[in-house]
Amino acid sequence: MYLKISRNAKGRASLSICEKYRDPITRKPKDRIIRSLGFADTYDHLYDDPIAHFRDVVKQMNEEQKHVSSLSVLIDMDEALVPDSSDLKNVGYGFIKRIYKALEIDKFWKGVAKKEKTNIDLEKIFSLLVFMRIIRPGSKKDTYEHRDMLFESFEDIKLDDVYRALDYYTKYDAEFQVWLYDHSAPLYKRNIRTTYFDCTNYYYDISKPDIDELDEDGNVLKKRYRKYGPEKNHRKDPIIEMGLLIDADAIPLSYGLFPGNESEKVNMLPIIKKAKSRFGLERTIVVADRGLNTSDNIFYLNGNNKKENNPRDGYVYGQSIRGADKEFKKWCIDPEGYQNDKITDGCDTIIFRHKSRIYPKTIHVNVDKDTDHPKKKEITVDQKQMVYYSQKYAEKQALERQRAIQRAEDLIRHPKKYDKVSAKGASGYVKNIAFNKETGEVIDLNLKLDVEKIEEESKYDGYYSIVTSELNMSDIEIRKIYKGLSRIEETFRITKSELDTRPIHVTTNEHIESHFTTCFAAITLLRLLEISLGNKYPAPQIIESLRQFNCVNISSNIYRMTYTNEILKQCGALHDIDTGKKHRTKEEIRRILKY
């Protein structure tokens, strides 16, 4: 530490105690203020030479810091535990908080509170919800009840204020998404030339879906989110759908929510359109799986693609082979035109067997969609179609089908064992199958194995197709870009398994939206920390490390740290913090947490 002297235009000297540190983003040395002392002349009545006095103070502080390791602590061996309390405090969230502060998220919500003229501490509640979503995910009530597990005090927060704050978070969600992007872009060099889109759903532990608000004529005034739909794990609970857009480095860009009974196919373009408008994005190549590869999602994103340098957004979509037309199927399995290239796939070198063509694809686009008489229009678009073959993928598909066939044969022999849900996957290989509409039970009507379908499917084992608007993109680049979709699937897994985004405990549309605002902030901050660590550690390991970085108070001002590992060591290295140090003063921990 040192005494910093700054003089204004009139020559008055202001004093502050500062220390050197290394910026975690730029890695350049910087200074930070430990304590502001004000103008030197305000101390003239106390000291003959205020500057000399405070230089001595700083010198003494440095000496005390050197000798803090030799402090003796008196322990009362008869001291009793306080019932229903824990001395264990988490400090790991501090590394998330540092990014939170770097993005000035605190400034955003303080600005909202000032604008709304509310006495609710929107920023403090938001930070609590975000940090606890990573450290100890749970309902809003559960988060409130366990808020004392964080080192900082959140005791002045009231549970009613937590729920009242949610109404503000949904109101400013769109602005907040823009704020996150604008403040992260210069620090992390956001790559939005390629973006990835996918949808998932989250379930509720409720017995009935929501009912939309209708007017007197039966027109929908307000759609409710919680509806029955195809839940990813085949649960029968009501769900909500979320579409997520991430950048090329898997950092979330934007998201949208829609009712669980709506198709993800029709919600992709509106979410992308909103994101582009909000962020002022220029041309981007949208990558999505084959479930989102529709005529509308081709044409309304890219047009007919006839221009040599099409200024419209591009796409890279997965393409179903088994569900394609006869000409495309025949082209895929025709051995003519295939070439073999050695490529690096992770740590392995593999043979990439592939071929491609530029093809005038005929699609049927919905026009006049917002009228009472929508219709289809036939359009031809230029598209690059690439197909590749993988023996490993062929073996995987054959094995999965064989397992389904075994269940189909068992279903044929014992139809009463199955219903519509339990027969899923196997029923596709059974002829004449039908289900009771009320009970879902299998109706026994001369069930037979569909041998023809099995033979037809097996022709295409190992083949995978990807289509794109980028006519000059190489086959290897197409495959590489498409493989990036795994990062958005991984993001969904993190939100569900690590951040416990589901089941959702709030009920109104506004509170549901706010729940996702805090979850979106949490996963974004987590991804930025992952990038800061050089993408060397998977997110679940980072989360677990942050959760384990705790301390216990052993005297009024001394704490014992309880855990460290290599990930925490690297987190500390970003900020010149030794996470291997066993004992810390309260002031040292406060510096980690920047408060």
Placement of each model-derived feature along the sequence:
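Anion-binding and metal-coordination hotspots
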Residues: 3-9, 13-15, 24-26, 103-595
